[in-house]
Amino acid sequence: MVGYRMRILFIPASAPSHYFPMVPLMWACRTAGHDVCVAAQPWGESVVVSSGMSMVTIAKSFDMTEELARHRRRGPVETAPGAPPALYQTLVDAQVRFAMEAADDVVSLARDWRPDLVVADPLVLAAPLAAAAADAPLVHHLWGPDLLRGSGYGYPGCGMAPDGWPEPLRELYARHGCEPRTENAVTAVDPWLESMQICEIPSRIPLRFVPYNGTNVLPPSVLAPAKKRRVLLTWGSMLVIRDGIEAFPVADVVKTLHEHDVEIVLAVKGADRGLVPDLPSGATVVENVPLNAIMPSCDAVVHHGGAGTIMTAAYYGVPQLGVAATRDVQTCCARLAATGAGIAVNREDATVDALASAVASLLTSDRIGPAATALRGEVLAQPSPAEVTDRLAVLAAGSSQ
């Protein structure tokens, strides 16, 4: 919307992998002349700033990574029949605690800066408090399949009636004078393809996924053409923290790939380098290289099933094999497999023989490649971040009248 300048407050969830999908829309907002500020925890002081955005630090004393790691150390927990899985309940409890820690910070920021629009990850339960404090619309920014709405277990503000919310969350909203609602957001921006979604999303705005996986100095080998077919192996940024490296069969995948005439590239965080097994000839490791830098040169990718990895590969038309350990990423992989552009194997089924069969199909199928190309076309057909920025400006302008 020409001539209307917005202040937009973005509030990502407590992980870089949830921040990255927001960055292209932030860039589009900035290049359209709008002001952008990010409210994030201390991890953002490097991740957010390196993406070119300014930020305000919130909830300094709460460590979501430690919360998830504590759950993993505790081990399996039995739940009653029909109750949400323990991991899901842990997620909800942790997000309520995060909201309680972040509430005063985001409300103070919203009152001082007066954003015209608040764009937040739907996980962030303090975001409606900020929107209410600024009298601004709240827009949810999704990152993958809408698991909060489509899981069947319910999540506050994403289809769950307020009488089902945790009592501490209702008390928090009452303290800040914010009415709890079944739907907290007026609309949802969705970079996950509608054809791969798991449920209907009210007032959905489709957004073209544009890969952003951070920045770094690249080794020249990453940009050099591959001498033979290149297969990328990656297990994302949160798997080790949340589930442990045993959730991804690194050694078995490397062994299986080595039986084919391919170049194997493992993309890992520097902190995970020590988890890489002894590698055969023809396999290399690159550390802290953004996936969007190396993915275009790859002929296939084997990964843990994260939504960001799936969509980055989809954007470049790369065939995929997802080996997924938990229900959330298993859902992502199942939706990918339904397009024909990839193969899904659940971790508990990932025997050496099953991996060998899946890898052989990935590298020899005459159907997966064309399906991956078609999926890329579907991604590129979605509205650009610039187009979505214009829609958000109309939304904000209408609410201010």
Locate the predicted segments by residue:
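Donor-nucleotide binding loops and adjacent catalytic segments primarily
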Residues: 4, 207-300
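Nucleotide-activated sugar donor-binding and catalytic core shared by glycosyltransferases
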Residues: 5-13, 22-37, 50, 155, ...
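A nucleotide-sugar donor-handling region in carbohydrate enzymes
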Residues: 41, 163-239, 269-273
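Short loop/helix-cap segments at secondary-structure boundaries that form the rim of catalytic
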Residues: 44-52, 128-133, 182-183, 196-203, ...
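Short gly/pro/ser/thr-enriched loop/turn and capping motifs at secondary-structure boundaries
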Residues: 45-46, 62-65, 145-151, 329-330
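Phosphate/nucleotide-donor binding subsite
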Residues: 54-113
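Conserved nucleotide-sugar donor-interacting segment of glycosyltransferase catalytic cores
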Residues: 90-171
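Alpha-helix C-terminal capping/helix-to-coil transition sites in glycosyltransferase folds
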Residues: 112-114, 184, 296-297
